[in-house]
A protein has these predicted regions:
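A glycine-rich beta-to-alpha transition motif near the start of alpha/beta enzyme domains, typified by
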Residues: 1-121, 172-287
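N-terminal, positively charged, Ser/Thr/Ala/Gly-biased leader segments
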Residues: 1-17, 127, 139, 144-165
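Short, solvent-exposed secondary-structure boundary/capping segments
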Residues: 120-129
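Ligand-binding beta-strand-loop-alpha-helix segment within the catalytic cores
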Residues: 133
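Extended Gly/Ser/Thr-rich low-complexity repeat segments
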Residues: 136-145, 281-286
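Selected transmembrane alpha-helices and immediately adjacent juxtamembrane segments
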Residues: 162, 170-173
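Membrane-interfacial helix-loop segments of redox and metal-homeostasis proteins
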Residues: 165-167, 189
Length: 287
């Protein structure tokens, strides 16, 4: 399954048990010797929500949250009838969705609204991604102060200005004039592993196109360059507003597609809406 190109292998743990998910993630994510993907996501029963999701990056490390992944988990859960959808889900001051699910994540229980077509298929999912975390000690970043906004950082002999946000997982956002010319693999890896970030960090380079649109490229912690990062797009929405560069309701253009974002003043939560697609099902042989 994928959310605008951010592709993971999903395992239905209502039916299967995965003894070593970190090892499986490394093997199955290999695009030459495995299925190929940005990582592995387990969909499992939950004691406190409709389902529980666990995310493993391509290098086997476990992630707290995946914005594109949670939309795919919602689609799979509804269409494969792992749980019955609940009632209405509303975005304050915006629209309402007739069906909802609660999904347990490493960032707590998140509620999603489902856009369902006439064939009972989920076409889009809106996720309440929760409130952004801005304090450096909670992101975490080895800096002092209340926020990390337009903070200088030295990377490979260059001084860059970063804004850091956690959406349950850590993000460093850098604004630039041309995202295509950025040496993303070189800079992304260096920033991810910089000593300012005790848990490493996701890295995003962003161009502001209009007051309501931006274009971004991502280097994901543990996975490298990806087509999209949902939590990253939410972090960019927040970072752009904090820097006075953009409005709180905007559209993010990612290499894999677009996401609609809203950092709501009423409840301080970030709402993300986008598609989710199931590509194929298969059987992975035990080795």
């Amino acid at each position: 399954m994928h959310g605008i190109g951010n592709d993971y292998v999903y395992v239905n743990c209502f039916e299967e048990q995965v003894e070593d998910p970190a090892a499986l993630a490394r093997i199955i994510s290999d695009r030459h010797r495995g299925v190929g993907g940005d990582g592995l996501i387990l969909i499992a029963p939950s004691q406190t929500a409709d389902v529980r999701m666990r995310i493993f990056n391509a290098d086997g490390s476990e992630a707290e949250m995946c914005g594109n992944g949670i939309r795919c988990v919602a689609k799979y859960t509804y269409e494969h009838k792992l749980a019955q959808a609940g009632g209405e889900f509303s975005v304050p001051g915006q629209r309402s969705f007739p069906a909802s699910l609660n999904i347990e994540t490493g960032n707590g229980i998140l509620t999603v609204g489902l856009i369902i077509d006439d064939t009972d298929k989920v076409r889009k999912v809106c996720v309440n991604m929760g409130q952004p975390i801005l304090s450096p000690q909670d992101i975490p970043v080895n800096l002092t102060g209340e926020k990390v906004v337009a903070q200088p950082i030295n990377v490979l002999g260059r001084e860059l200005l970063m804004t850091c946000v956690s959406m349950g997982n850590p993000h460093a956002v850098f604004f630039c004039d041309d995202v295509r010319s950025i040496e993303l693999e070189k800079l992304g890896s260096a920033i991810e592993n910089h000593n300012l970030f005790p848990n490493r960090i996701n890295v995003h380079f962003v161009r502001i196109d209009k007051p309501v649109e931006f274009t971004m490229r991502t280097w994901e912690r543990g996975s490298g360059i990806t087509m999209a990062c949902g939590t990253g797009a939410c972090a960019v929405c927040v970072a752009a507003a904090l820097n006075g560069r953009q409005e709180r309701i905007c559209t993010g253009h990612l290499p894999g597609g677009d996401l609609n974002l809203h950092w709501c003043e009423e409840d301080n939560c970030v709402y993300m809406t986008g598609p989710a697609d199931e590509v194929f099902e298969g059987v992975w042989p035990e080795k």
